[in-house]
Amino acid sequence: LLSHDKGNTMRVILHALDELGYEVDYRVIDAQNWLPQHRERIFISGFRRDIPTNFTMEDVEVPVGRKHVLSDILHPEDGSEIAEPPFTVGQIAKVADKYTLTPKLWDYLQRYAAKHKAAGNGFGFGLRGPSDVARTLSARYYKDGSEILIEQGDGIPRRLTPRECARLMGFDRVGSNRPWLIPVSDTQAYRQFGNAVAAPVATAVASAMAPWLTNTVAIRSRKCRRV
């Protein structure tokens, strides 16, 4: 967004918010500080000018120290997780075979990546293991899953399941007693999670803004009581 149309798109957005009477700030935040996914997104905050605040997006606390890796969100496939058909099946809750790429698709992705590499282009599938960080999950993931493929030893890799996508976006976690409800098809789930905002990042932004809103409500409440 920052570079779209040579920055004009962002300028139009900021100008529109300014005209509406908002004091605006923005910041690019990478979700990999919370989740095992490299996902840079612009977060824009806005307070009406009649609300007294010194808030800036730099007030958003970004956790440091722990590196999040894919094993945090992958199905363990060791029996420690209850099977959840159609995502996982059997006594050890193994990922269902349908998430493994077909030999034809895997062959195509390898040839396509090799062709682009030879031409000096940047296309390549994102093959990842349990100790890695994923590429950005996008709404096109349902097509071939190429941006995040999970290694399966020497075999053909697989896509993430929708449940793993929910975890990758911070809506769910391994071992949750109340897993995020996924009432739609895999295709729709991939689209929706790929279009979503990483939940813990949104929570961090909202948590940083909330005290200013609470303070404003308290001030106005006191003024009303005096009247």
Residue ranges and their predicted role:
Residues 1-136, 140-142:
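Class I S-adenosyl-L-methionine
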Residues 95-227:
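C-terminal target-recognition/interaction regions appended to catalytic cores
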